[in-house]
């Protein structure tokens, strides 16, 4: 483990200058907010003027000025979380470690604190390692994501890298809401054309992957299509023509579940409207079909 080029592997934890905040706030119940925030600095015998300066600056940044004389029992969940953050940040750490810090918050408060955390991190410029099982938190907050499974790194990169260019089926399925549509298809060469036969559903191979699929004729592949990459087409003239099975209104659009020859696909449609039982046609956005090996589940196409 290195920090700014210095090997910290065998440095005692208390000397690494890493601040940590966990799902449980672990505030001292008998201390005020002010005392909770200043305690670590006091134990290091920092000058009183410096302690006051740091606590005042951090409480102002986190909106805690009016809460400094209260105890944890008098605070809401969101306020306690901000106190825990403030207590860590006043130390001026080199690295900030957050382990599922929003796990105890309700959905509305989680959105608010997520926004505040991102703003604070950007303002302070502290390298932050944020551990979460929530892909929405990872996608909305991270500059760089490391996606792990069973202790192994599956892929790392920017949020867009993982969303638009997943290197395997696991990554493609984990990132994105609703989950990516997955179809196991057999690659067939028919009268000079390359087709994807998925049970009763048959698709013409998109131009950008035809050459690649020629190598897999007679074999199975898995195609992945994100709901947001399906667009409406004139009725009966789409690559996917089916009947609406279910609709989830979102206000500014809707999720539509389309039964296409026995395969149910979900599409994320902006604007417009549709009803259950109606015929609907969809196209896949050009260059947006993801191909995976049916055995290794690794990505086949580079795009």
What are these regions (language model features)?
Residues 1-16, 46-51:
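ABC ATPase NBD Q-loop/coupling interface
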Residues 4-8, 114-117, 208-209:
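A generic local structural motif
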Residues 17-19, 23-170:
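ABC ATPase nucleotide-binding domains
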Residues 159-190:
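ABC transporter nucleotide-binding domain
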């Amino acid at each position: 483990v290195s920090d700014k080029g210095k090997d910290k592997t065998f440095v005692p934890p208390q000397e690494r200058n890493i601040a940590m905040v966990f799902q449980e706030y672990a505030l001292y119940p008998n201390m005020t907010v002010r005392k909770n925030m200043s305690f670590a600095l006091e134990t290091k015998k920092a000058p009183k003027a410096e302690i006051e300066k740091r606590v005042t600056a951090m409480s102002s940044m986190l909106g805690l000025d009016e809460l400094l004389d209260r105890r944890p029992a008098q605070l809401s969940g969101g306020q306690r979380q901000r106190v825990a953050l403030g207590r860590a940040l006043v130390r001026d750490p080199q690295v900030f470690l957050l382990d599922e810090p929003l796990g105890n918050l309700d959905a509305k408060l989680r959105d608010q604190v997520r926004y505040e955390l991102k703003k604070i991190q950007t303002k302070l410029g502290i390298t932050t390692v944020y551990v979460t099982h929530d892909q929405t938190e990872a996608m909305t907050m991270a500059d760089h994501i490391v996606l792990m499974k069973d202790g192994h790194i599956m892929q790392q990169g920017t949020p867009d890298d993982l969303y638009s260019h997943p290197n395997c089926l696991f990554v493609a399925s984990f990132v994105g809401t609703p989950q990516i549509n997955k179809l196991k298809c057999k690659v067939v060469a028919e009268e000079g054309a390359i087709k994807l036969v998925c049970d009763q559903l048959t698709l013409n191979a998109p131009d950008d992957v035809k050459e690649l699929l020629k190598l897999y004729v007679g074999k199975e592949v898995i195609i992945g299509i994100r709901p947001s990459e399906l667009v409406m087409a004139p009725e009966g003239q789409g690559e996917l023509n089916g009947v609406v099975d279910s609709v989830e209104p979102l206000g500014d659009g809707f999720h539509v579940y389309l039964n296409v020859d026995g395969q149910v696909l979900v599409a994320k449609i902006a604007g417009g409207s549709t009803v259950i039982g109606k015929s609907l046609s969809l196209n896949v956005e050009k260059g947006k079909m993801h191909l995976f090996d049916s055995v290794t589940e690794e990505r086949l196409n580079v795009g």
